[in-house]
Amino acid sequence: MTTEHLRFLKKIRRRRRMVVFLRILILFLFLLQWEICADTGVVDSFIFSSPSRIVTCFLKMTEDGSVFHHIGITLYETLVSFLLVTLTSILIAILLWCFHGLSEILDPYMVVLNSLPKSALAPLLIVWLGANTTTIVVAGMSVAIFGSILNLYTSFSTIDQEKIRLIYTLHGKRRHALTKVVLPGSIPAIISNMKVNIGLCLVGVIIGEFLAARSGLGYLIIYSSQVFKLDWLLMSICILCIIAVLLYAIINLIEK
């Protein structure tokens, strides 16, 4: 390894450390400013709460374990909907790729379904499926699945056609083109899709919990807003932010 190469790697590591430091610094300054404004009365601490009050609220709720129950419910529903979206979208995208005529027929319907405001579907899901976990999981799926199918099908369709023709030249079948070229070539798109879907599924689950849950962080947000326990509300939002970051980091780790 040359000196120039070592110097370049050192520069990259230094830049990464600086990025991490600046991210932490921005978060720290924001929390510090928030705490100072709440303590000095610049903002109403009852309405806007403060970092110290949120931490105190979290610690109190850990004593009886209720906060972990709500977190566990939301995580379970999010992961189930995410796994179902990932598997279903891959299978349907494969089906559309295998039958091009079917994709031409269904394309406008997929676009329309993807454009629908999913929050408007949640009350209908409650009528159809009842106020239960299934409804919340389906609500989580509905936010992500149609866009995921469209993205994956587009990725499958834009694979290098020369490689596919080479498979056919060697007397391969369509299934060989799928397993040897299309799917391996689409792995980056699938991983990228998973990064987007994990956040969308979390959003969909929270929407479902707003309307059809008796536990979970979405339920806790609605309940705390109704009884003006804004410390609970902001604590739930902060926990959701942490969950979203951790889930994204896990997918990012899988990609590497």
Give the residues covered by each predicted segment.
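Transmembrane alpha-helical segments of polytopic membrane transport and secretion proteins
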Residues: 1-25, 249-256
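Periplasmic/extracellular loop-to-transmembrane helix junction in inner-membrane transport proteins
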Residues: 12, 40-83
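Hydrophobic alpha-helical elements at and bordering transmembrane segments
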Residues: 67-71, 75, 105-112, 178, ...
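Transmembrane-helix boundary motif in ABC transporter permease subunits
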Residues: 80-110
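Generic hydrophobic transmembrane alpha-helix motif, especially the helices
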Residues: 111-147, 154-155
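Short helix-to-coil transition segments within interhelical loops
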Residues: 116, 156-162, 166-186, 226
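Transmembrane alpha-helices
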Residues: 138-142, 175-208
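Hydrophobic alpha-helical transmembrane segments of polytopic membrane proteins
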Residues: 218-255
